[in-house]
Amino acid sequence: NSAPQVVVRMNRKESAVLAPYVRRLAGQSMASFQKRYRFQLKSPVVIEIYNNHEDFAVRTAGMPGLGLLGVTFGNVLAMDSPSSRAVNEFHWGSTLWHEMAHVYTLESTGHRVPRWLSEGMSVYEEWRTGPIKGISIPGYVYAALAANKALGVAELDRGFIRPEYEQQVQVSYMQAGLVCEFIDRRWGFDKLVTMLGEFGRGADTSAALKTAIGIAPADFDRQFREFLQQEFGTVFAGLKPWSESRRAAMTAASRKDWKTAIASAQSALKILPNDVEDGSPYVPLAQAQYALGENQQGRTTLE
């Protein structure tokens, strides 16, 4: 049974370098998702890649200035090319993987999957099967989860559609990914596939949970909160010292107090080693190492 092919539409100047990589990565994701979701796509996947972010924004939402990286409409997905954004602004391969997961969750449910599960599965697939594996969560998301800002699973769509505080959409993406991670660990990946099947038949979140894992949303929310505490309790407890050390490292580096910058940055990174957001302690740490002539350490820090 031959897999449907991938059609790539992109700027001719970039296609020689990028198109083979796109086809290979899209093909790998399709081989993986076809097996995992037990679903064969019926038509080719069309991947449109824009080397100008404003063109992409107008094509996908009808307005420039949009902050999205990729958008999926069934078996057509549109995304920025690596050259349309600053270096290090996003990992391009992970974004493609994320969007390809949407193709499967949308198509396999006849587009009935709720936003929270489609986004959750895409984030979860980035972490589990994507080109850069491992759970990666920004500090502000940990802070929101520690402050009990996680929505109940039956309300989670609201966090995407009607956010009530800054960064709630991003927090909801991460929470949805963690909900999928939790279901997989506690009940097994198959239950996520069962839920997709239920949504495809028109069930709501409450009914899909009941069929797949036999519990109501309120009970699920309680167990999910326990899971967060178990997984990230140490990080939650360390958020205040993390934030203080992070700030201290920046301040010390701006004053050229390199010893303090190194000590503070290392304290912050002990708590959140994956902190690569704006204001990351890796920046003052590398600055200090270079300033003290520790060029090899500086290079390692920036990698």
Regions found by a protein language model. Give the residues of each.
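Juxtacatalytic substrate-recognition/specificity segment
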Residues: S2-P114, E125-G134, Y142-A150, A154-S172, ...
